[in-house]
Amino acid sequence: KSSKEDLAYEFKIPFTIFKNKIKMIQTSSIIANIDTQTITKNNKYINSIINIPIIMIDNKDISKNINDEITNSIMKFFNDSQKQAKEYNDALSEVENKFVANVDFDVKKNSDNILSILIKYYKYAGGAHGYYENVAYNIDIRNGNFLTIDNLFKEGSDYKNIINEEIRNQIEELIKLDEQNKGVYEFKSIEDKQKFYIQDDNIVVYFDLYDIAPYAAGIPEFIINVNKIDHILKPEYKEIFK
């Protein structure tokens, strides 16, 4: 993670900042107001558009901690990409396409004291196609805690096997819909810190490119409805799916 001093240095890079409209969902529970800070960079090495969520709640300390965590990760991607772009350009006598590095985000849930936000990274460094990765942050905005999937479930519960079975069932359905999906997915089990986001009454489990399927399959997502897991959720997290 970057220190405050490092972060201040990072922002000395020339860029243009725009303010986009605030994304806000009305609800009776605590919500976050979310603004967007946009960094653009276009030179002989790189084309880059970086959209950073700026999260605002009444508790300024919690807001700062959340923003530091997310912003530092995004800025590391941006700075690393600029270095890679220069190396990429210098290594080739002729560059057909510029290096591309973009970041955007989707707010998946902003209600019931939970903010679930998906940061979408994209990088192109030549070749047949670019590479993209999604990083979800699931935050209890009452206390600023970043939730991992195991945080949601009662200790000792068999949440992994329940989710694994549901994913296998969904893969079987994909194969029934299209025989070409047979043999595409090589799924064994979710991980201890499995990637996921929260949306409506669902936990959406997802996998990186190549994790369980080839590039052409994209980022596989599997929707786990609360009805499948309600009996093993911790009491304090049952309310987020109401």
Which residues make up each language-model segment?
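Compositionally biased intrinsically disordered regions enriched in Thr/Gly
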Residues: K1-K242
